Swiss-Prot record:
One of its GO terms (molecular function) is pyrimidine nucleotide-sugar transmembrane transporter activity. It holds the Pfam family Nuc_sug_transp. Essential protein. Sugar transporter involved in the transport of CMP-sialic acid from the cytoplasm into the Golgi. Keywords: Golgi apparatus, Membrane, Sugar transport, Transmembrane, Transmembrane helix, Transport. The keyword Transmembrane applies. Its main location: Golgi. This is CMP-sialic acid transporter 1. It is found in: Golgi apparatus membrane.
Amino acid sequence: MAATPWYFVAVLLTILTSSQGILTTLSQSDGGYKYDYATVPFLAEVFKLIISGLFLWREMRTSSSTTSRITTDWKSVRLFVIPSLIYLIHNNVQFATLTYVDTSTYQIMGNLKIVTTGILFRLFLKRKLSKLQWMAIGLLAVGTTTSQVKGCGEASCDSLFTAPIQGYLLGILSAGLSALAGIYTEFLMKRNNDTLYWQNLQLYTFGSLFNVARLIADDFRHGFEKGPWWQRIFDGYSITTWLVVLNLGSTGLLVSWLMKYADNIVKVYSTSMAMLLTMVASIYLFSFKPTLQLFLGIVICIMSLHMYFAPPHTLVDLPVTNEAHAKTLKQVVVEEKTDS
């Protein structure tokens, strides 16, 4: 699995992520959900847990103990609680943010996580980026934001700047938490040589427990009006709903692979391109009207993608090297001696 080219996994992640919103929309009935959407993340975590367990079992049977490394020390295992805790806080901050700003403003502010990921990537993982790569990350944020901005004829342009200051502060916090969770997960995946499937098993075990805690909290909040969550967990589920669960679980597994064998920037590009792909697909599936902003956003993001990942010699003309310059001088000297 580790020998798989990272760009293949990144493209697959882009396709699956782009279909996430489409499948979720198709799972609705009469403009709403017949199922409890809070159960979807829980089942996705369980799916990832089962798949990781099966792959770990297979790896342990077919590989030697030297190639399949597992760290069971509690000091190491407990670190996997932190990403789940960050995501739990992030989800609550998301809901709080949406009480102050509208959906369009929230989506645009969400693009701050692109830049914050780059900053945390440098600060915490000590990974250096070239000036050209920093420019590419900035362009990616501009491109995704441009594609989401509506024209003044469709919605009030002033609405982007009329929210209370608390809304903007919470939006910045939300972007920071999202980036921090990704960066910390990458740190965990690369801090030792443990097999990916064992790391996933730890990550998704705590993820499942936190999702159970959320479902129980929802039951208490609503006074068990519809009964305990485990008695109605599959109520209203359709084939499309199960596809949403499988899609969400599969994207999670791909993200963890990228965290182990690539990095957060690759994931950011994959998810950003997925957003644009979703918009394009919506033109055909949901009669979404394409806009100039969407076209410009796609062009800018493609430019950013090329700037970040293309080999340097394809972007600029490389200067003459000292070695080549020395050869030129020798040639001139020889010619002068011949003439004399």
